[in-house]
Structures are given as structure tokens and as C-alpha cells.
């Protein structure tokens, strides 16, 4: 009898738990709070009320009936955030803020979220298990503009601009774009092919026309001239589409901050004020069917103002599948940490440090019990590790770290610190890296990285594995990278930007690289297809364990060779390099392998008569 009663009690308890769970989780519609689609009213205050209701029901889904929703800065929450690779413009204006919320899904049902003015559409702050899905984000007036060349002479450049989509004024002879609560002047131009929407080859960061006089010939027709002969002009052909860069990177599109288990599904960002999706000090992030691409219904070739997916100081697994990017003004993906310099040793357990890059200032660099690497910046050698006991900010640029044990012998002012706890694994599959300014995928993390089954059509290098403590201070020596079954197409590396030494560029900034202290290790490039119009295929500096094998190299003649490197593979201060069993189709140009600061015996070329080591 006791056994029967005990079983009955357990079943009743389980039933009550299930009922309570169902009662706690529910579907909540923004329409319950008076917000209707296509009403053109400010959605911000209504959504704030809906989110407050969701807090009372963990596991809820907040749904938007399909339609258009508009967001203005009025009623938006304003809060200071120090966002990496973003200028310190605070407070941030937050259209939708999720703060300390767990177990919530936001389902847009295919809705359009239209922003007005400078703002951050979504912010996730100390959240867990949040899913955002089924919506698009765009701006009524983008923070980047576009035009078409109508005339190009040795004296001037005429540009046709849709003044409804990109309102402008001429102010002090500068072409100045205006929007809701902002104005900013043209400071750079990118050139796109009007038919393919690819960045025109060998244009890249052509910084001409920074000094100019602007005049309006007719409404929507602007002439840039150079009476002082200071503009360093270039002359794109009539019909060329120009992305007219202005404004600054001051808000992310989606900011994921100190959050865990975040998912984005079926989301399109047609524009952002700065970085597209910025994940900072967050863990376990999954993006599936997420796209940062031009809004073709508005005849745009431009999309985001800067990077696409940017991950700094993250951990756990970054899983990126079935995503695409095009028309960005910076890299589609960048994964890295942040180095800081030791300015002063205050005691055996206390060091004063400084953010050396202004777009890193203000961040919380670390937390108790996290592991620190100590780096000698000239060779980029990690000489020791330690544990952090306390982080104390002195100001936006400087901070004090208290260590759990005394500083390792030999570490002194001038050394650099790296957070080794905030280093993620990454899986990037079935994605399309379309034509954007700069490179395709930047990865700097010691975690396990798999890059497979992707298509690359980047303007610069398709993949950059960097890391430095001397310029950008973006840390992360890789230890396990597999690049497999990808298709590297023209226009990969058809324009030169920083670090674009080859289609795949392994280019850490090391002032004095030494082969006995390799920075990166265990990089395998296998079973890929390269469509090559130029010589440089692979550049690698300071790698221990580099394999380039079973790839198919196909000659492409879409554009003529232009790159200053005339070798296929360039190796510097590397060891244990294997080049083998690669298939050649057509008269591929880059057959020479050059080495520097290493011996011929450090490279093994086998089953591959095509590649020849330069003596």
C-alpha cells in the first residue's frame, strides 16, 4: 500500500509540474498591447510593455502579426554600452532591450522592422535561451548612401542620387546626407559593377575624392570637382554603382552581451548603423538562415555599414549555418579576442593595463577565475599563464588586474595580456560570402574551428587568420582549424585591403617572427576548389603544422593578374608544412613556393609536380 501511495504521489506531482509549466509559458502577441501592423506608429513603447509581460511567463513566445512595424528614438531606452570595434557614442538608443530575461522566443512571422534614425534594433543583455526569428530589419533612411555615375571626366564626377531614399544637402561644398536627427558628409566611395553587384576589381579602398567641391547640377544630380587638385581622383565609368560612405559606426544591429544560448533563425538585416550582429562576452550562439544583404526591392547594392557577424571574447560554440552576406562595408565574419598592454607592474599580484585600440575602450576585459596569457609582443610568444582574481576599471582606457598568484618571472611592463577563457569553438557551414568591401572570414581563436561547404566571393582575401598585439590588438592564436570542401570563386582577392596577401592569408602581425616560436598551429586546407585568376593562393606566417592538400586549382580568366605577389604559396617562419596531391586544371599561374626564415626541409611537397620550391 505504501508503494502504491508513493507512486500515486509521484504521478500527481509530475502532473502538477507539467500544468504549472504550461501555465507559465504562453504565446503573447504585441497586438494584445495595442500595436497593430502597418499602422506607422512608434512600436517602441508597446513592445516594452509586451516584454514586461513576457518576463512574468518564462518560456513564452512574443509574436508579431505579419506586417510593417516602425521604430523611432522617442520612448526608446537609452543606456551606455562599450561595444568592441565601435566608436564610443553613448548612450546607445535601444529599440528593443531584453535585459536579464531567460527562455523567450520573439517570432516576427515575416514582419519588417523599420528603424528611423541612429539606434540599435535589438539588445540582449545578460540573457539566456533567447531565440529571435522570422523578421527583417531595415532603415527608412540608411546610414550609407548610393548613387550611379552619369559622367566621368578628367575634371569632375557626376553622380545621380535617389534623393528620396538618400536625402542630401550641399553644406560648405560637401555632399552631406541627412536623416531623422542626423547628418553626415561623404568621406569614401566604393565601386560596384551594375550588373553583377560585385566590387569592381582592383578598386578596393581607393580613397580618392576625399577632398572635393560638391555642387548640385539638378535635383538628384551631384557634381564632384577638384579645383584645388587635391582629391586624388579616380574615374569610374558611367553606369558604375557607387556606395557613398558617410556616418560612423556607433550602434550594432543586434547586440548580444554577456548572454548564453542565443539563437537567430530566418532573420534578414538589410542595413545597420555599424556592426551587423555583435556578440560580446557571450556563450553558445547559433545563427541559422541569417542574412545581411542588400534590399533588392529598393535597388540597393549596399547592406550593412561595417562588419556582418562580429564575435569578441565569446566562448562555447559559435554555430553559423546557411547564412549569407553581400554589400557590406567590412568583413562578413570576424571572430577574435582583445589584447591589452601591461603599462606598469604595481606589485607581484597587481598590474596596470591599457586598451591600446580606442574602439576597445570601456569594456570589462575579464572576470575572476578567468585564465590570462602573457605575451611578449615582438615575437607574439605566450611565455606564461595565470588566473585573474579581480578586475578594476580606472577609466575607459586603463584598468588594474589582480592575479591569484604572483606574476610569472620575466613578465614586465610592455608585455601583453590575452583572455584565454573567452575563446570559442566555431563551425561555419553552407554559407555564401558574397562581394563586400574587404575580406570574407576572419578567425582568431584557439578553439576548434571548422569551415566547410561554403562559397567565397569576397573582394579581398577569402579567409584571414591574423592575430596581433601591435595594431588592432585582436588576439587569438589558432590551434585547430579545418578548411574543407569550400568553393573559392572569382572575385576572391581581386582588390587589395589590409592583410590580403593571398586567397587564404595567414598573416599575424609579428614584428620579429621566429620559427622556434610559431604563433599559429594545426591548420589544414583540404578538398577545396580554388578558381584562380592571379598568382597568390596561400600566404602563411609563423605556423607549425600547415597542410595544403587534395585541393582543386582551376585557372580563371575573368580578370587579369594584378597582385604584387607572383608566387602561389609564400611561407615565412613556418615548420611542418605539407603540400600534396593537389589537382590542377588549366594554366594556373601560382606554381612557385617561396620560403623565408625557414629551411627547405621544413616543407614537404609530394604527389604534386605542379608546385616548385624556389631555391
From Swiss-Prot:
Enzyme class: hydrolase
Signal peptide region: 1-23
Cystine connections: none
EC number: 3.2.1.n1, 3.2.1.n2, 3.2.1.22
Keyword annotations: Glycosidase, Hydrolase, Repeat, Signal
Keyword Transcription assigned: no
Extent of the PbH1 repeats: 282-313, 423-445, 446-467, 478-500, 520-541, 543-573
Alphabetized InterPro entries for the sequence: Beta-barrel_GLAA-B_II, Beta_helix, PbH1, Pectin_lyas_fold, Pectin_lyase_fold/virulence
Single annotated GO MF: alpha-galactosidase activity
Keyword Hydrolase among record annotations: yes
One Pfam match: Beta-barrel_GLAA-B_I
Catalytic activity: Hydrolysis of terminal, non-reducing branched (1->3)-alpha-D-galactosidic residues, producing free D-galactose; Hydrolysis of terminal, non-reducing linear (1->3)-alpha-D-galactosidic residues, producing free D-galactose; Hydrolysis of terminal, non-reducing alpha-D-galactose residues in alpha-D-galactosides, including galactose oligosaccharides, galactomannans and galactolipids
Family the UniProt entry places it in: Belongs to the glycosyl hydrolase 110 family. B subfamily.
Function, as annotated: Alpha-galactosidase. Removes both branched alpha-1,3-linked galactose residues of blood group B antigens and linear alpha-1,3-linked galactose structures.
Protein name in UniProt: Alpha-1,3-galactosidase B
Amino acid at each position: 500500500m505504501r508503494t502504491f501511495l508513493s507512486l500515486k504521489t509521484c504521478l500527481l506531482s509530475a502532473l502538477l509540474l507539467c500544468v504549472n509549466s504550461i501555465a507559465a509559458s504562453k504565446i503573447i502577441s504585441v497586438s494584445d498591447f495595442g500595436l497593430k501592423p502597418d499602422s506607422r506608429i512608434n512600436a517602441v513603447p508597446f513592445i516594452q510593455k509586451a516584454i514586461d509581460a513576457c518576463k512574468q511567463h518564462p518560456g513564452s513566445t512574443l509574436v508579431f502579426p505579419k506586417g510593417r512595424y516602425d521604430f523611432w528614438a522617442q520612448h526608446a531606452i537609452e543606456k551606455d554600452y562599450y561595444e568592441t570595434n565601435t566608436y564610443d557614442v553613448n548612450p546607445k538608443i535601444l529599440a528593443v532591450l531584453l535585459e536579464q530575461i531567460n527562455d523567450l522566443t520573439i517570432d516576427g512571422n515575416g514582419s519588417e522592422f523599420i528603424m528611423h534614425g541612429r539606434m540599435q534594433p535589438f539588445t540582449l543583455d545578460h540573457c539566456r535561451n533567447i531565440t529571435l526569428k522570422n523578421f527583417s530589419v531595415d532603415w527608412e533612411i540608411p546610414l550609407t548612401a548610393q548613387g550611379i555615375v552619369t559622367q566621368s571626366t578628367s575634371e569632375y564626377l557626376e553622380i545621380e542620387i535617389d534623393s528620396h531614399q538618400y536625402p542630401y544637402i550641399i553644406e560648405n561644398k560637401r555632399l552631406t546626407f541627412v536623416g531623422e536627427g542626423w547628418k553626415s558628409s561623404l568621406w569614401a566611395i566604393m565601386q560596384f559593377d551594375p550588373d553583377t553587384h560585385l566590387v569592381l576589381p582592383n578598386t578596393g579602398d581607393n580613397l580618392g575624392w576625399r577632398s572635393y567641391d560638391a555642387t548640385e547640377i539638378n535635383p538628384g544630380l551631384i557634381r564632384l570637382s577638384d579645383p584645388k587638385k587635391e582629391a586624388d581622383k579616380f574615374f569610374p565609368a558611367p553606369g558604375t554603382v557607387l556606395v557613398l560612405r558617410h556616418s560612423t559606426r556607433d550602434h550594432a544591429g543586434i547586440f548580444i552581451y554577456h548572454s548564453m544560448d542565443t539563437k537567430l533563425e530566418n532573420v534578414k538585416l538589410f542595413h545597420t548603423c555599424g556592426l551587423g550582429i555583435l556578440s560580446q562576452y557571450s556563450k553558445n550562439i547559433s545563427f541559422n538562415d541569417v542574412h545581411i544583404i542588400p534590399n533588392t526591392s529598393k535597388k540597393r547594392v549596399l547592406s550593412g555599414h561595417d562588419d556582418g557577424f562580429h564575435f569578441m571574447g565569446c566562448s562555447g560554440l559559435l554555430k553559423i549555418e546557411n547564412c549569407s552576406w553581400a554589400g557590406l562595408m567590412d568583413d562578413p565574419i570576424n571572430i577574435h579576442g582583445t589584447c591589452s598592454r601591461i603599462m606598469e607592474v604595481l606589485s607581484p599580484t597587481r598590474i596596470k593595463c591599457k586598451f591600446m585600440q580606442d574602439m576597445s575602450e570601456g569594456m570589462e576585459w575579464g572576470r575572476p577565475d578567468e585564465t590570462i596569457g602573457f605575451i611578449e609582443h615582438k615575437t607574439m610568444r605566450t611565455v606564461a599563464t595565470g588566473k585573474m582574481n579581480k578586475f578594476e576599471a580606472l577609466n575607459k582606457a586603463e584598468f588594474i588586474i589582480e592575479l591569484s598568484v604572483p606574476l610569472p618571472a620575466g613578465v614586465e611592463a610592455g608585455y601583453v595580456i590575452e583572455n584565454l577563457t573567452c575563446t570559442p569553438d566555431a563551425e561555419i557551414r553552407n554559407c555564401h560570402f558574397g562581394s563586400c568591401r574587404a575580406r570574407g572570414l576572419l578567425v582568431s581563436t584557439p578553439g576548434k574551428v571548422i569551415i566547410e561547404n561554403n562559397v567565397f566571393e569576397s573582394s579581398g582575401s577569402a579567409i584571414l587568420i591574423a592575430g596581433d598585439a601591435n595594431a588592432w590588438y585582436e588576439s587569438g592564436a589558432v590551434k585547430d582549424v579545418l578548411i574543407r570542401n569550400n568553393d573559392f570563386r572569382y572575385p576572391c582577392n581581386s582588390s587589395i585591403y589590409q592583410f590580403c596577401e593571398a586567397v587564404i592569408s595567414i598573416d599575424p602581425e609579428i614584428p620579429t617572427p621566429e620559427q622556434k616560436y610559431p604563433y599559429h598551429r594545426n591548420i589544414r586546407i583540404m578538398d577545396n576548389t580554388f578558381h584562380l585568376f592571379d598568382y597568390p593562393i596561400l600566404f602563411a606566417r609563423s605556423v607549425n603544422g600547415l597542410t595544403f592538400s587534395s585541393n582543386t586549382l582551376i585557372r580563371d580568366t575573368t580578370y587579369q593578374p594584378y597582385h604584387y605577389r607572383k608566387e602561389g604559396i609564400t611561407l615565412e617562419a613556418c615548420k611542418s608544412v605539407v603540400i600534396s596531391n593537389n589537382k590542377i586544371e588549366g594554366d594556373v599561374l601560382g606554381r612557385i613556393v617561396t620560403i623565408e626564415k625557414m629551411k627547405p626541409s621544413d616543407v614537404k611537397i609530394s604527389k604534386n609536380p605542379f608546385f616548385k620550391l624556389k631555391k
